[in-house]
């Protein structure tokens, strides 16, 4: 008897479970909502339809959301979407960190029905991911121009590749992500156009050549790479001492400042071409415009004259090279939301 009493004191009775205790609906709803952006009522419905299993409830919610998005997309398919934003991304600028690299950039216009949705953060995030996708999957073009239109069909069928959330990559195509956003905001979401500029680095046998891409937008909301007006400009640099110049941090800073000013110039003026046709003066010609968007000395010159002076001041050009060396704008693209394509 003493042994029994000792045993009962030394080893107090505990209740053993063969399975984990059941969790309350409130606890499960809290856990589900931490993983999915749904209301308490929606979370409860999902759990009750999924045997109170959070993993199954997540799948149930995804299925319901997809079905709802498909219905909404079909309902708004015939509507007009002329609002939206233009997004730009530069994955590789051509000159970076003191060396020549390749060029990889893109510009995309994503449309919706109202300015209200265009200012929605979800819309901005989707545009950022689509623009990154276009730049990432594009291949160098064997064409006369560097900037090339990107196929809408190819882009819509491509897996959405996010630069900020790589864990989400491959879970949906671009078109599926657009449809999902329609389900969330209730408006038609459509792609109007996209272009990319992709060029592999120049080889070591071409040490005197480099490219530099400049991106700029105007009227941005959430993201400084998105706005109602967007532009990409491609510059060429040529000099026998280019490698030496690029290695200088001062030169890199000056080049950044120049590119930013050129982007503002293209957007801020009615720029339609780079040079005027021979024997004429075109107000839309970039090189003939006063370089008002450059902050600093020399902005009273035309853009063309300024670029020549800029190259000379940085010893990219000497008297024997004036016709072939320096810095030059090769191409540019300028878009405004809702343009007729």
Curated annotation (Swiss-Prot):
SUPFAM superfamilies: Elongation factor Ts (EF-Ts), dimerisation domain, UBA-like
Organelle transit peptide residues: 1-17
Molecular function via GO: translation elongation factor activity
BP GO annotations: mitochondrial translational elongation
Superkingdom assignment: Eukaryota
Entry keyword set: Elongation factor, Mitochondrion, Protein biosynthesis, Transit peptide
GO cellular component: mitochondrion
Signal peptide (residue range): none
Annotated localization: Mitochondrion
Pfam families per record: EF_TS (PF00889)
Primary localisation category: mitochondrion
Function of the molecule: Associates with the EF-Tu.GDP complex and induces the exchange of GDP to GTP. It remains bound to the aminoacyl-tRNA.EF-Tu.GTP complex up to the GTP hydrolysis stage on the ribosome.
Homology family: Belongs to the EF-Ts family.
Protein name per Swiss-Prot or TrEMBL: Elongation factor Ts, mitochondrial 2
Species this protein is from: Postia placenta (strain ATCC 44394 / Madison 698-R) (Brown rot fungus)
């Amino acid at each position: 008897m003493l042994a029994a009493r000792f045993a009962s004191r030394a080893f107090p009775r505990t209740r053993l479970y063969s399975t984990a205790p059941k969790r309350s609906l409130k606890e499960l709803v809290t856990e589900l909502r931490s993983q999915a952006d749904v209301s308490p009522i929606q979370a409860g419905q999902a759990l009750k339809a999924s045997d109170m299993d959070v993993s199954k409830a997540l799948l149930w919610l995804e299925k319901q959301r997809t079905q709802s998005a498909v219905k909404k997309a079909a309902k708004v398919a015939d509507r007009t979407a002329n609002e939206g934003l233009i997004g730009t991304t530069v994955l590789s600028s051509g000159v970076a960190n003191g060396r020549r690299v390749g060029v990889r950039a893109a510009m995309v216009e994503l449309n919706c029905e109202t300015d209200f949705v265009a200012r929605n953060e979800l819309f901005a995030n989707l545009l950022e991911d689509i623009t990154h996708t276009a730049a990432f999957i594009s291949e160098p073009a064997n064409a006369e121009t560097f900037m090339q239109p990107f196929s809408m069909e190819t882009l819509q069928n491509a897996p959405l590749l996010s630069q900020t959330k790589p864990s989400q990559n491959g879970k949906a195509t671009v078109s599926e992500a657009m449809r999902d956003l329609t389900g969330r905001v209730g408006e038609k979401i459509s792609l109007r156009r996209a272009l990319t500029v992709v060029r592999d680095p120049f080889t070591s046998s071409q040490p005197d050549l480099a490219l530099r891409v400049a991106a700029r937008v105007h009227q941005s909301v959430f993201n400084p790479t998105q706005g109602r007006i967007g532009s990409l400009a491609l510059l060429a640099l040529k000099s026998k001492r280019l490698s030496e110049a690029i290695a200088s941090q001062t030169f890199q800073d000056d080049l950044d400042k120049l590119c930013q000013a050129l982007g503002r110039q293209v957007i801020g003026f009615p720029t339609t071409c780079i040079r005027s046709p021979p024997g004429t003066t075109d107000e839309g010609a970039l090189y003939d415009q006063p370089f008002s968007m450059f902050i600093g000395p020399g902005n009273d010159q035309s853009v063309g004259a300024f670029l020549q002076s800029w190259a000379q001041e940085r010893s990219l050009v000497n008297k024997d090279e004036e016709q072939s060396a320096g810095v030059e704008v090769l191409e540019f693209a300028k878009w405004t939301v809702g343009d007729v394509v």
